[in-house]
Amino acid sequence: MAVPKQKKSKSKSRFKKKNFLLKNKIIAKNQYNNYFIKHRCLV
């Protein structure tokens, strides 16, 4: 019973990590877009 439990937690953590990376990518993209828009407004 302990082995499937370990597997489950492992896949869950992997999914969390994937989600976290995806979120970071989106945030980075938004920050870049915001900077680009501000820069364009200044120029």
Curated annotation (Swiss-Prot):
GO terms for cellular component: large ribosomal subunit. The keyword Ribonucleoprotein applies. InterPro entries: Ribosomal_bL32. GO terms for molecular function: structural constituent of ribosome. Keywords: Ribonucleoprotein, Ribosomal protein. One of its GO terms (biological process) is translation. Disulfide bonds: none annotated. It comes from the Bacteria. The keyword Ribonucleoprotein applies. Belongs to the bacterial ribosomal protein bL32 family. This is Large ribosomal subunit protein bL32. It comes from Carsonella ruddii (strain PV). The lineage of its organism: Bacteria, Pseudomonadati, Pseudomonadota, Gammaproteobacteria, Oceanospirillales. The gene is rpmF.
